[in-house]
């Protein structure tokens, strides 16, 4: 079960996680992860829809059917974006193409993930220069699954490649660029040891009115395995997450 949250800038549980082991296992699976992780692809698509709907309403017009379409000539409301736990770049590519930021800092625990996102980095192949118009059948560059139902707004017409960089390290200790407009991630937060401290750090690095947007797993994820074996990650409930955020952030949207 997934939770999505968008939080505007405005009781800590610490769990013991072998991050070196986590990094090795994700690195080992990196060549097949993008092909097999269909749920993560769907989560990334939904995250982008929620982000554009709830965190930047001035950049989109909403139809009666609830879908979001781009407004002609609008610039992205997020000039500087950080994605922690970028993995193989599924969500990264959606952010890059839909929001077209000036800078995009990608972070992951695994240095090997650079191989999976090399096409987005200056040393890799350049991104294609092509129109990015709203189209129900558009397939964003690099996405594994066509986004026929995603209907995300695409800002501008030509694709302008921003300064994309990759920094492999533990996001819990990473000093993000000061004045970041959006700190975001999909399906990563559950691996963190001290979530409350991380939220505090995010607040420090966000710009005035900046956004923290993330999805993570809920308490019922892998519940049967946890019950049978007694092993598994400790997940927060939705109310627990909101409580951790309440002292520093205004919650714009949260769902389970």
Residue ranges, per PLM feature:
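Substrate-binding/catalytic lobe of Class I Rossmann-like enzymes that use SAM or dcSAM, i.e.
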Residues: 234-256
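Conserved alpha-helix/loop element of class I SAM-dependent methyltransferases that forms part
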Residues: 38-57
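Conserved class I S-adenosyl-L-methionine
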Residues: 211-240
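A short glycine-rich, Lys/Arg-flanked "PGG" loop and its adjoining helix->strand segment in the class I
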Residues: 196-211
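A short SAM/SAH-binding and catalytic strip from SAM-dependent methyltransferases
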Residues: 181-195
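Short, small-residue-biased leader/transition segments that mark boundaries at the very start
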Residues: 1-7
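A short acidic, Gly/Pro-enriched loop at the edge of an enzyme's catalytic core
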Residues: 172-183
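Class I SAM-dependent methyltransferase SAM/SAH-binding core
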Residues: 80-136, 142, 156-174
């Amino acid at each position: 079960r997934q939770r999505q949250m968008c939080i505007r800038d405005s009781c800590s549980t610490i769990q013991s996680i072998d991050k070196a082991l986590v990094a090795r296992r994700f690195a080992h699976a990196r060549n097949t992860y993008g092909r097999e992780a269909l749920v993560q692809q769907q989560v990334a698509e939904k995250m982008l829809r929620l982000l554009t709907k709830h965190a930047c309403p001035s950049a989109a017009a909403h139809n009666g059917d609830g879908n979001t379409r781009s407004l002609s000539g609008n610039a992205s409301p997020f000039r500087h974006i950080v994605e922690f736990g970028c993995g193989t770049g599924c969500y990264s590519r959606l952010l890059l193409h839909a929001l077209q930021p000036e800078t995009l800092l990608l972070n992951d625990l695994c240095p090997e993930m650079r191989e999976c996102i090399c096409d987005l980095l200056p040393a890799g192949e350049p991104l294609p220069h092509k129109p990015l118009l709203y189209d129900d059948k558009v397939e964003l560059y690099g996405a594994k699954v066509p986004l026929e139902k995603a209907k995300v707004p695409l800002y501008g017409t030509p694709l302008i490649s921003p300064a994309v960089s990759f920094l492999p390290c533990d996001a819990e200790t990473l000093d993000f660029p000061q004045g970041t407009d959006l700190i975001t991630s999909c399906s990563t937060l559950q691996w963190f040891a001290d979530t409350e401290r991380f939220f505090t750090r995010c607040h420090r690095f966000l710009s005035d009115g900046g956004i923290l947007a993330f999805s993570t797993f809920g308490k019922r994820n892998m519940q049967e395995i946890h019950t049978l074996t007694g092993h598994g990650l400790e997940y927060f409930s939705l109310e627990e997450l909101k409580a951790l955020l309440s002292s520093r952030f205004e919650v714009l949207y949260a769902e389970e």
